[in-house]
A protein has these predicted regions:
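Positively charged, small/polar-rich N-terminal and surface patches that mediate targeting and assembly
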Residues: 1-104
Length: 104
């Protein structure tokens, strides 16, 4: 099954580094960087707000663990967001491209 993994980053440089590494290492076929999202969350008992960058990482379900581990190695957050959403349907040619772009 194909997946989109969500990961927030503190800045564009961090998002670009993680995205580039995952694609270069063929853990992901593609990663989109959405700029300047606003996150509201609870951290250490306080409600926080930050501007962040959101990665949309296209990969395969079998690659979730290696992608998660690589993000944790590269990320500056103590607890980085790494959430996978299964792709139920999509353009077959695009999904085939994802499959063929990942090193298994």
């Amino acid at each position: 099954m194909h997946q989109v993994i969500l990961c927030t980053c503190p800045n564009e440089a961090s998002a670009t580094q993680i995205a580039t590494t995952l694609v270069e290492e063929q853990l992901a076929a593609c990663a989109n960087i959405l700029p300047k999202i606003k996150s509201v969350y609870r951290w250490q008992g306080k409600v926080e707000q930050d501007n962040e960058y959101l990665l949309l990482i296209k990969t395969l379900e079998t690659q979730f663990q290696p992608v998660k581990e690589r993000i944790q190695e590269l990320h500056s957050y103590d607890v980085p967001e790494v959430i996978a959403l299964n792709i139920q349907q999509g353009n077959k040619e695009y999904l085939d491209w994802i499959s063929n772009s990942i090193l298994l």
